[in-house]
Structures are given as C-alpha cells and as structure tokens.
Design a protein with these regions (language model features):
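Non-cysteine beta-strand/loop elements that form the S-adenosyl-L-methionine
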Residues: 208-225, 293-302
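A cross-domain feature marking catalytic cores of carbohydrate-active enzymes
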Residues: 118, 167-169, 193-197, 218, ...
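Auxiliary Fe-S-binding modules of radical SAM enzymes
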Residues: 2-81, 251-361
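Conserved Radical SAM active-site core
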Residues: 85-209, 213, 223
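Hydrophobic faces of well-ordered beta-strands that scaffold small-molecule active sites
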Residues: 114, 163, 191-193, 214-216, ...
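Conserved non-cysteine loop/helix-boundary elements of the Radical SAM core domain that shape
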Residues: 133-146, 167-174, 225-249, 274-280, ...
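Alpha-helix-loop-beta-strand connector modules within alpha/beta enzyme cores
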Residues: 178-190, 241-249, 332-338
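Short, catalytically relevant binding-site loops at active-site mouths
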Residues: 197-201, 220-223, 232, 272-274
C-alpha cells in the first residue's frame, strides 16, 4: 500500500513548492502579481520629456489666466483677482508642511507621508473636518520656486515616502510648476493628489504625467445632498468624471514589496450619519464604471465640526441647532452597510486590518 494517496501527494507537493518560494523571498506576500512592482519606482514626472515639461508649464500659466480648475468655472484671471477659492495665481497659501502619520498605512509607511496642507478650498462642506484652514486663508504664502524647496526637504530631511498635496484642487497650476522645478533639483518620490474629487477634467489633464497616486474622497451622491452639505449641487457629475479620468491615467493601486503604494487610485468615502444609502450608491457606481479592483477606504471618523451643531434660527425664529440630522458621530452599523454594499458590488480591495496576518494590497 502506498505511503501517501495521490491526493495527499499533490497537497504535499504544493506545500513544498510554497515553502521553497517563501525561503527565496524572505517574506509572505498576499497579493496578486498585477499589483506588485519592483523597487525602485520611477515617478511619472521624472519620465516627462523636456518638451512635455515645457508644455505643462505653459498650460499651467494659461489656466491661471482664465481659471477653470474646478467645476465652478470662475474664469477669472488669478494674476489680477481671485475666484471662489480666494487664492491668487502667483503663490499658494500653505498651512502645514510636515511628515504626516494620519494617512493610510500604504502611504505613511515608516517615515510618514510628506503632506502639504493647503489653505482654501473650492467646496464649503458644512461638516468639514479641516474647516479652520479650508474655509479661510490661514497660512503662509509660497511661490512655486519656494514650494519646490520644501518638497525636497520632505524627501531629504523628512525621508518621506511621497509628497502628499492635501486639498490642492484650487492650486493645481502652482503645484505642477513646483513639482517640475523640484524634479530638476532631484525630487524622486511619488506625488499624491489628495482631493475632494471636485475637479475639472482640464485640471486632471494638466496633472497627467505629474501625479502618481490619486487620493479622491467621493463624498455624497444626491444633488440635493451636495447642494445642502457641500454647497455644490453638481458635485456628483464632477466627481464621477474626475475619478474616471484619474483611473484612466494611473489605473489600480500598485505597491512595492514593502507594502508602500507607488501608483494608482485609492478612493476614500467618509460615511456621513444618516447618509449610508448614498455611500451604497457610490460603491455600486465605482464597481460598475471604474474598476472592481479599485482600492477603497470606507472611513468611519466623521465627527460634527464646522457649522454642524452650531446655534441658529429656524423658520419660525426659534433657536435650534444647525444641521441637527448630522450632529452626531457615525454609527458602525452605517459604516458596515456601506462596506457590505461594496463587497456585494464586486469591490474587494479595502484599507482595513489584514485577515491573513500580512498586509492588505
């Protein structure tokens, strides 16, 4: 009688093959090969030809002279005046530049994500978690040449894994100019575009070849919700167009073997109390129209801020709390509804603790 049955022999053969693989690679990798790339990664802006870089510079200045960077389409000459965002064309207003450890693990890694928090925004979210710098100009002004110097400091002194532009929708031309200047000076880490997804297609086109990782936050679905909570009734149309364009440029999120993201789209959705159904619609649209392999972060850290819960006057003149329906933390049941809908729609790559003891890719 044979020592092992044919079935057991096949199982043991597969096990031995896996052990051999692990011994050669010295780590357990839990990801499909399409999402793994070799290090070192060469950022997209380092691959631009001198001619393409010159075209980017020219287009950047043209956008500032007739601003159409976001769907508000102010069309103002920002060298002479300002539009909805209140930021001129000669500089950017920056609140903080520093290694940041509050991002997704695949972005912050060990040394942090080199975050540049811009002041100002093209939305007016009533629940804004950073309203103190987003709803007004609060920071210091930097010309593109000065911003470029800071990007290099994030790389050399901070040893950051990437440069992370936070709320940059209204300063895209200045960002492009700064990255191109820094590239000539030795910048070589990926660029993260951390956006509310209220971008114009012209803006995303200008960023093509500059940005490595798009980090959009798709906030709400219904026009009435966007009008009430974001003060931008056309938010959904703009977000759908811009997210699809981002994915067309860089594809699904890919990593080096150390678990650090290098290129692709990582989409966020902050679940708002009472609006989980809109999160469900967003997940269904993403799976059907963008990619089932899209990396998604369903976020649960909503907290009443900005105008939510502030005292106001009702229709009859009685004192009441503004936006009382979202004046509470989000419930985990609401978050779970969105996550389950995402899985049912076909999405499977999530930012959450790994079930297998490794890291989720």
């Amino acid at each position: 009688m044979p020592l092992f049955t044919p079935r057991l022999s096949r199982i043991l053969a597969r096990r031995n093959h896996r052990l051999t693989f692990l011994s050669h690679h010295h780590r357990r990798l839990h990801l499909a090969p399409p999402f793994l790339i070799d290090d070192p990664y060469i950022p997209r802006y380092q691959q631009l030809s001198s001619i393409d870089a010159a075209k980017k510079r020219s287009k950047a200045y043209a956008h500032l002279a007739n601003c159409n960077l976001c769907p508000r389409l102010c069309s103002v000459n920002r060298f002479e005046t300002t539009g909805h965002c209140l930021i001129p064309g000669q500089s950017v207003s920056v609140n903080t530049i520093a290694p940041h450890f509050g991002e997704e693990p695949c972005l912050q890694g060990v040394h942090g994500s080199g975050s540049v928090f811009f002041s100002g925004c093209n939305l007016r979210c009533v629940f804004c978690q950073n309203y103190d710098i987003a709803h007004k100009k609060a920071g210091f002004d930097l010309a593109p040449e000065e911003l470029a110097q800071w990007l290099l400091k994030l790389q050399t002194t901070g040893r950051c894994h990437n440069v992370n532009f936070v709320t940059p929708e209204h300063v895209v031309p200045q960002v492009v100019l700064a990255v191109l200047i820094a590239a000539d000076m030795g910048l070589r880490i990926p660029i993260v575009y951390n956006t509310s997804a209220f971008d114009s297609l012209e803006s995303i086109e200008l960023l093509d070849g500059i940005v490595d990782i798009y980090l959009p936050d798709f906030k709400v679905w219904e026009a009435r919700t966007a009008k009430r909570l974001l003060k931008a009734e056309n938010y959904r149309e703009a977000a759908c167009e811009s997210v699809a364009a981002m994915h067309a440029q860089v594809g699904d999120l890919i990593f080096t073997p150390d678990g650090i993201a290098k290129k692709g789209v990582l989409l966020r959705h902050l679940v708002i109390p009472g609006y989980a159904d809109e999160g469900v619609q967003i997940m269904q649209w993403l799976a059907k129209n963008v990619s089932e392999d899209l990396m998604v972060h369903v976020m649960e850290q909503y907290f009443p801020r900005a105008h939510v819960g502030k005292k106001g006057r009702g229709k009859e003149g009685k004192e009441e709390r503004r936006y009382a329906d979202i004046n509470r933390p989000v419930k985990m049941d609401e978050v779970d509804v969105v996550k389950e809908a995402a899985r049912e729609a076909g999405l499977w790559r999530f930012v959450e603790p790994a079930e297998h003891g490794g890291f989720n890719l």
